[in-house]
Amino acid sequence: MDVEAAGRHEEVQKERKKERNWTLREETVLARSKRAHQNWHCFFRQEISSILYYSYNDKAMYIKYNNRGSIIKKRSWDSVIYITGDCHQDFRRFNMESFPEQKEMSKEDYVIICGDFGGVWNRNEESKKEKSLMDWLDSKLFTTLFVDGNHENFDRLYDYPVEEWHGGKVHKIRSSVIHLMRGQIYEIDGKSIFTFGGASSHDIDGGILEPDDPDYKKKKKELDEWWRPYRINHVSWWKQELPSLEEMEEGRRNLALHDNKVDFIVTHCCATSTQILLGGSMYKRDIETDYLEEIRQNISFNKWFFGHYHDNQNVNAEEILIYEQIIRIV
């Protein structure tokens, strides 16, 4: 056998040994797990960093190895939940460099976005950019959850099939990119989360234009010349940014079923009285802020997180406005 052939043979043997080690490690861990819990199963293996992930009854654990196959870290956990504010299709905050905590997360851990997700925006169908972004989020170790804001394409968002997830209704954009619908309560590791997306667009001084209006082009040109902000119906604005009576009533029913008590409330905008604290008369009250005021006055909760106003601020001990920060809540 010449030197080159010997080198190739040695590399092949190394690869086979590495694979045998992986198989042995996996079988050993599974055998140990089965002795403790017959229902444990491996649901993810990330070979690059030598991590095995397991789940059991919606609980999760991971075991991390060094290159010699020895255990260097073991974690058994309830789900971890982080929360952040408006993204507007800019998901750079979820890069590994900006959000290093994700290194130790799994699909049983969650990041919640408080509206203006922006991942479902293109007019008629998913664009190449959207597909790339949604696939990228779906590839993350964690699961992305979001309530809707006022900057979503509701024609497309509401066209996704309605599914049940953790006790509430959702739209699944990807298997681990999930829209939390309005008026729902989700149970995650014993924590109850009430969600209610939507808000009024307050940056439309020029009004809403109708594409089929005979004077559409003329009106648009005038508004552009005067730099007045406007929206175009079913292109950049949808009436569903504000809730329907049915959505509000469903929220009331679900809260009543939980004795009007939840751990967390996640919305896009906030209650009328809270909005006054934030901007005085800058923001107008509407059907949703008044509905959320009703919730605020009648529901027992620990923390309320919301976005929309593009700031990071503890309004009071219970209500937290969040924008670009990512904070852990569980």
Where are these regions (language model features)?
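Core catalytic region of metal-dependent phosphoesterases/phosphodiesterases
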Residues: T84, Q89-I188, S281, R285-L292, ...
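Intrinsically disordered, glycine-rich low-complexity segments
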Residues: R8-R20, R25
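Binuclear metal-dependent phosphoesterase catalytic core
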Residues: Y62, R75-W77, Y283, D290-N298, ...
